[in-house]
Amino acid sequence: MIENITVLVDNDSWILPYAKDLVDELNKLDKNATLAQHHDAVNAGDVCFFLGCTKIAAPSLLSKNKFNLVVHESALPQGKGFAPIAWQILEGQNEIPVCLIEACDDVDAGDIWLTDTITLNGTELACEWRELQGLISIKLAVRFVNEFGSLVPKKQTGQVSFYPRRRASDSELDVSKTLAELIPLLRTVDNEDYPAFFEHEGCKYKLEISKYE
């Protein structure tokens, strides 16, 4: 039985409010759930959920809990690595697979405990698909806790591929493309941290995007 749970977010991530909601949901189930924002704040227990983490988890950290679980949004082992939803939006995908996997030494290589799907309609901006990402992370974590006794993890099988880290330069718009061609990229940019931009006649311009109701 799962009783003692830590939810870890080791940076100032957009997912932090969802991590707090997850802790609340787990405590409503009469679990002993806590939020940690540093690796050294993780308690010894049954499960640690790693949400939006960016730092490498040392073996000493992983040894604190029986299960160390990560949410990854791709059909693993395809799409390991960084920003899988953004990359799949750029590929034109609307059905985004989501896996709850065991954290291990190799990147995104752990056994798969649960799967689900985020369904997009093709219009969502980053703030909107991030909300779906946060909600499905909560859903999978709660399912693991509730269904643990009947779950059987599966090994990853198939062709392996990796997504590279997205950087601010990836938000540059190609002014030779039509607006319609640029929509997928505009759906992945963050107006604050990595806004869309373009260069023209030696000047750099920033574009901010939001829905206009």
Q: Where are the language model's segments positioned?
A:
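One-carbon transfer enzymes
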Residues: 1-213
